[in-house]
Amino acid sequence: MLEKVFKLKENHTDVKTEILAGITTFMTMAYILAVNPSILSAAGMDQGAVFTATALASLIGTLCMAAFANYPFALAPGMGLNAYFAYTVVIGMGYSWQTALTAVFAEGIIFIILSLTNVREAIFNAIPACLKTAVSVGIGLFIAFLGLQNANIVVGGSTLVQLFSVDAYNQANGVEASFNNVGITVLLAIIGVLITAIMVIKNIKGNILWGILITWILGIICQIAGLYVPNPEIGFYSLLPNFSSGLAIPSLAPVFGKLDFKNVFSLEFVVVVFAFLFVDLFDTLGTLIGVSTKAGMLDKDGKLPRIKGALMADAVATTVGAVLGTSTTTTFVESASGVTEGGRTGLTSLTTAILFGISLFLSPIFLAIPSFATAPALIIVGFYMLSNVAGINFSDYSEGIPCFICIAAMPFCYSISEGISMVVISYVVINVLIGKAKEKKISVLMYVLVILFILKYIFL
């Protein structure tokens, strides 16, 4: 039956290889079950409910990939997109998280429509490759900066940010924490970064997840030894899992179906939706093409067969995920780990999806993982995304300067959408003024985007 459904022989694989590949993929991306609730809780969302939404969205999205495209790719709420959701749309722009979920839902619907037509190719071809790369790099820096903040390695100060000290932390947050509250967690986070980095260099499977778990375990040891002292009143909780409710699945009720359509006709809301769509679209296409190239899945013309099904799985997962109560669900680049293990069909995805289902019953473990343990994951994921900077031709200043503006704007303006706006405007304006617009083959769509972004800055 499995042979008939997944065409294993045709894809030169077998059941054992596919299952092992699915387990490997899950190990490399399971960190999202701890990181996503942590990030979205900063937007005021219930952490337990977001955990359940994250697991379910990952389960459904990955199943869709297996069913629609028969590819070994897994989906989950995307890093960068969740940070944009919480820190830019909600905290920075002042929208409620319910409105932000509505923007994700709208993006998913648009993505479904684009996936049913050839519009996605037109959009993909309209944006220069260097700008797509710059967006990825900028998000990487933004994520790494969030990791440094979540670990309290950097704190607010008279110089906007400064290296951690207990006094600086207390002054920035208006609390009276001690070394045994915050100081030890900073040291543990730094150790976690080093441990994760070593495992990445050694190419250990599941390095990011293992980095989180090891950092957390070291924290538990410190708590038992009295080096870490919980103080819930100022945000430092016990690191031990709370099994008082058994292995019950946290209720979805606080976030399920909480869409708010009041602001959907505002220009700023449209910009937010576009930012979600832009990043999701190019992140998905980049992941699909990059991983499938590594696996030798492209046809003789360099195209990915059944890409429409893969994009549809991504679009459906995003739409369903928004209703469940999580930020944009997208294809994970960590799928490459399963492909490296020999995964070639949807059976790999099915295996990963089943493991996400099992994880629903392990919420006390994932929800007990502190931000200082997940911060190293953010920093290392930031490194992965930053490594794409090699694809930008900085010797061509007409490309390099706009890309630099994008990369710098995202962390320094604390906004992914501002980086996207600035790179599109600067790229078009610079190349028009120096007479390179025709040479660069700037599309009509790019000019339309420039007008929209300029209107945003004038009227918002």
Regions flagged by a language model, labelled:
Residues 93-217, 350-460:
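Membrane-embedded alpha-helical modules
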Residues 23-30, 60-63, 67, 144, ...:
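Hydrophobic/aromatic residues within the transmembrane alpha-helices of Major Facilitator Superfamily
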Residues 44-63:
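Loop-to-helix transition at the N-terminal end of transmembrane alpha-helices
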Residues 1-49, 175, 212-307, 451-455:
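Helix-loop-helix hairpins and the membrane-proximal interhelical loops
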Residues 12, 16, 191, 270-274, ...:
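Alpha-helical membrane-protein architecture signal
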Residues 38-49, 88-99, 266-270, 370, ...:
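Helix-coil boundary and interhelical linker segments in multi-pass alpha-helical membrane proteins
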Residues 2-36, 57, 78-87, 91-139, ...:
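Helix-loop-helix junctions within the multi-pass membrane cores of secondary transporters/permeases
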Residues 58-79, 110:
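Juxtamembrane transmembrane-helix boundary signature
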